[in-house]
Amino acid sequence: YKRQVSNTYAWEIQTEEYGEGLAEHLRYHNNKILGIVNGIDTDIWNPATDKLLAADYDEKSAIKNKKINKKALQESLGLDVDEHKMVIGLISRLTNQKGLDLVNDVIPGIMDEHTQVVVLGTGDSQYENTFRYYENKYKGNFCAYIAYNENVAHNIYAGCDALLVPSRFEPCGLTQLIAMRYGAVPIVRETGGLKDTVQPYNMFENTGNGFTFDRYESGLLYDAINRAKTLYFENRKSWDDMVIRDMNKDVSWEKSAKQYKDMYVGLTPRD
């Protein structure tokens, strides 16, 4: 088997766009390609026992206690303290792969008196400098934390309302899994493991656990963010329902471990 970390990525690498010159070979052997999504350590990433948070919470107390964590996040990062603002997080290596050119394009359009953005990460200087520029331009509503700090990451997941993962490509991705665990609604591009783990919100059936867009275009990311903002501000009950669905989603290694076991059992010679 050629094991990949998501079903969609296992398919994507058989295309010319993602195959890096091996697409034809991989298509020939496609019956040996298997996608198994990663899980996260649900002991480390557990909002009910997380000592780094201002207030721990489970799905029953999330709606109330995420507001406490939002206030603590705003205070610690120098943002205007206002529980009514929508806080959008971005926790990422600041590189081209992560879709940051799209983010740069849409920031001026999404920043308003109701919205705050928090960026955590390091990487290419062009992105570091652009986010610093935005922090200065949107004082009190934009934070560029140009470093990687695990404690701050925990507090962003707990304090933000939504998390951006607009990657150009993403074999699996873990940030969207952690976000859901912490009740932060993911806004993702439909690629690799992001497509496999985030089901788009359906307003008619009140289902799904995030907001998605398909083609790698800033206009589509902008639309996805605006759909999220519209639901957040105009239908909080449905938003809160999605937060609870996300927290109840199994993002542990349990299911993946069983798939690995089944794979290896299948490879074991029979007597």
Predicted features along the sequence, with ranges:
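Catalytic cores of nucleotide-sugar-dependent glycosyltransferases that transfer UDP/GDP/TDP-activated
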Residues: 2-271
